């Protein structure tokens, strides 16, 4: 049975863990990092993912996709997408289904498709570490993600070749990693402020049970917004000093983004930092450089309102849980932004206690996902995890009213039913409009699906009995059914296309991903073959130089011919031919090595014979001990 890996698919960085026995283990990437940047880049020749994609972003800003999680499950005309379009260097476009996608080189990619590229990279890293194929995963999402965003995440997993065994909320995963199930009857708040989202979850734990009582948050608040405030400040400072607006220069903005992120991190440990960007732009007078000092106080003044805005969801979550701040026993900080001293101060002040910083905020979510994988596979026993649905679910009723069937913060999985009737005489069918949200009117909430229940017998209004049932699984994904109680006719819908991708789309993308994985493998084999060949050529040339005239002319000529042939093949794309030619050169170089050893052996033998002859001409060899004379000594006293 293959391992179930735990993945934190983050806005800025992603992380993967796996259970080894009873302990979760972080899987590092080939670059040695414990987290991988959630960045995908397209060049003229290839697709790059992770650290290598991030490194080239400055020179390729319009084809480098970052923070794709902010577009997951969102419509193109949503206010959040409008906000992101203002700052995004890459093109955000409207997909045929109305979702927000990204366009690179004339092709439109959906957000699950880009996310799948990141997941495929994490999957490959896990397979390289484990030495076996990985097909199953637990993937985390912000607790406040709606159904469309959860489904988009699940689809991304499928495209990447992963069966997503469970979608788990990030704060819940963090509580598992913290060891909440081992605690004795505690009330815990998990404050999760990451790169793109904010969640607050209130949990009760004890006796191997982790129960989420309430959750709240903002799926469009995180480190990216903090970075943008710093970028805006730097742009304004440069404009004041030089009269040049950098906000329209995509390459300069990418450099500013990297500098802003670094400055923000530096100011978590230092009181002041310096942004030094030489040759940031140029005008008719020559190149321009940026040199700006930022203090921690200045950063806090720039982002203070963002930090304060996290307290309102905290109040709502506590109210929904029926608790007050002073009843919370422990506050756990999760997400890279919680390293910021101002965030820690605001959280400490709100809850009236020092936050717990014992867990690694960048890795704790992936660690918890791996533990959840262990629970599902049976490796981790005696832990019961009870999560909740973050948003209310219901249908549209007469007058455009949103009628809730399942209230927010209901423990999942769950099933609720309610009987409705017709609004007019002889109504032959009813249209079921499924919604998710907290607003009283349907138009203000998010549509999950629409379907019709037809074939209702003619009857006065109010007579037919239509039972509508909602079913939410452990992943927080919704199924809805409607049944005519009189005829027994039933219509149901599993809300699986809310990510914007049909089953046909997903299967097509799965095939593309598999083909790309094959291409990636071929590229890797070609690179390895070239590297091996290059190393062998270097070593062989060095050996020839060391031997000089001592090398056999025929062997030397054969080797030089084979090296020339191999160099020519290395310019091509045929890995198998390079490997064959490398083997041939290796065999020829072995002959050279044998010749070298034979010459050394002959020289050693000749030197030994001369030494023996010298010993024979000298005095006879006796026992060295015979020449040793014992000596007396006298102690001299001063």
UniProtKB/Swiss-Prot annotation:
Name of the protein: Chaperone protein DnaK
Coiled-coil residue windows: none
Family per record: Belongs to the heat shock protein 70 family.
NCBIfam families: PRK00290.1 (NF001413), PRK05183.1 (NF003520), prok_dnaK (TIGR02350)
Protein task: Acts as a chaperone.
Keywords: ATP-binding, Chaperone, Nucleotide-binding, Phosphoprotein, Stress response
Phosphothreonine: residues bearing it: 197
Protein's organism: Desulfovibrio desulfuricans (strain ATCC 27774 / DSM 6949 / MB)
InterPro entries assigned to the protein according to its UniProt record, in alphabetical order: ATPase_NBD, Chaperone_DnaK, Heat_shock_70_CS, HSP70_C_sf, HSP70_peptide-bd_sf, Hsp_70_fam
Record flagged with keyword Zinc-finger: no
UniProt feature, compositional bias: Acidic residues: 627-638
Induction statement: By stress conditions e.g. heat shock.
PROSITE patterns in alphabetical order: HSP70_1, HSP70_2, HSP70_3
Entry GO MF terms: ATP binding; ATP-dependent protein folding chaperone; unfolded protein binding
Pfam families assigned: HSP70
SUPFAM superfamilies (alphabetical): Actin-like ATPase domain (SSF53067), Heat shock protein 70kD (HSP70), C-terminal subdomain (SSF100934), Heat shock protein 70kD (HSP70), peptide-binding domain (SSF100920)
């Amino acid at each position: 049975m293959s391992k179930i890996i735990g993945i934190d698919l983050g806005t800025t960085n992603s992380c993967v863990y796996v259970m080894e026995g009873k302990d979760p283990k972080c899987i590092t990437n080939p670059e040695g990092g414990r987290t991988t940047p959630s960045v995908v880049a397209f060049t003229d020749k290839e697709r790059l993912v992770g650290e290598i994609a991030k490194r080239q972003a400055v020179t390729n800003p319009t084809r480098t996709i970052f923070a794709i999680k902010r577009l997951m499950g969102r419509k193109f005309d949503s206010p959040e997408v409008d906000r992101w379009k203002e700052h995004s260097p890459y093109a955000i476009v409207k997909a045929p289904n109305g979702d927000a996608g990204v366009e690179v080189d004339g092709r439109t990619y959906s957000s699950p498709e880009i996310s799948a590229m990141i997941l495929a990279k994490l999957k490959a890293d896990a397979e390289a570490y484990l030495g076996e194929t990985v097909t199953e995963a637990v993937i985390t999402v912000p607790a406040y993600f709606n159904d469309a965003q959860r489904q988009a995440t699940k689809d991304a997993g499928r495209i990447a070749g992963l069966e997503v065994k469970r979608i788990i909320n990030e704060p819940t995963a963090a509580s598992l990693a913290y060891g909440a199930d081992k605690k004795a009857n505690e009330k815990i708040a998990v404050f999760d402020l990451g790169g793109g989202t904010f969640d607050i979850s209130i949990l009760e734990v004890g006796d191997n049970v982790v129960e989420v009582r309430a959750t709240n948050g903002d799926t469009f608040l995180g480190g990216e917004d903090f970075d943008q405030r710093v970028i805006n400040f730097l742009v304004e400072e440069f404009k004041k000093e030089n009269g040049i607006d950098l906000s329209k220069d995509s390459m300069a903005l990418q450099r500013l983004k990297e500098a802003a992120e670094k400055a923000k991190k530096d100011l978590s440990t230092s009181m002041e930092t310096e942004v030094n960007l030489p040759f940031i732009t140029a005008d008719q007078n020559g190149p321009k450089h940026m040199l700006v000092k930022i203090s921690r106080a200045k950063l806090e003044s720039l982002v203070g309102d963002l930090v304060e805005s996290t307290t309102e969801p905290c109040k709502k979550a506590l109210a929904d849980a029926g608790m007050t701040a002073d009843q919370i026993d422990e506050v756990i900080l999760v997400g890279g932004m919680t390293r910021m001293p101002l965030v820690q101060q605001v959280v400490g002040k709100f809850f009236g206690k020092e936050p717990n910083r014992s867990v690694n905020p960048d890795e704790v979510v992936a660690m918890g996902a791996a533990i959840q994988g262990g629970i599902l596979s049976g490796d981790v026993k005696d832990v019961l995890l009870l999560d909740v649905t973050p948003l209310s679910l219901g249908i549209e009723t007469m007058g455009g009213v949103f009628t809730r069937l399942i209230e927010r913060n209901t423990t999942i999985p769950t099933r609720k039913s309610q009987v409705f009737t017709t609004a007019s005489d002889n109504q032959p069918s009813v249209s079921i409009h499924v919604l998710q949200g907290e607003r009283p009117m349907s138009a203000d909430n998010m549509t999950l699906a629409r379907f019709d229940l037809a074939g209702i017998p003619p009857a006065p209004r109010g007579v037919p009995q239509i039972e509508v049932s909602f079913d939410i699984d452990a992943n927080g994904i919704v199924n809805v059914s409607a049944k005519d109680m009189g005829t027994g006719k039933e219509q149901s819908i599993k809300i699986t296309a809310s990510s914007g991708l049909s089953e046909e789309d997903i299967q097509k993308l799965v095939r593309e991903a598999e083909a790309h994985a094959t291409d990636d493998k071929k590229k890797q084999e070609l690179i390895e073959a070239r590297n091996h060949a290059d190393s062998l050529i270097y070593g062989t040339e060095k050996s020839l130089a060391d031997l000089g005239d001592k090398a056999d002319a025929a062997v030397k000529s054969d080797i030089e011919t084979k090296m020339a042939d191999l160099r020519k093949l290395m310019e091509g794309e045929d890995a198998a031919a390079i490997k064959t030619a490398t083997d041939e050169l290796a065999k020829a170089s072995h002959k050279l090595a044998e010749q070298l050893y034979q010459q050394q052996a002959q020289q050693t033998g000749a030197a030994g014979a001369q030494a023996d002859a010298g010993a024979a001409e000298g005095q006879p060899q006796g026992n060295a001990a015979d020449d040793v004379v014992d000596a007396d000594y006298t102690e001299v006293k001063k």
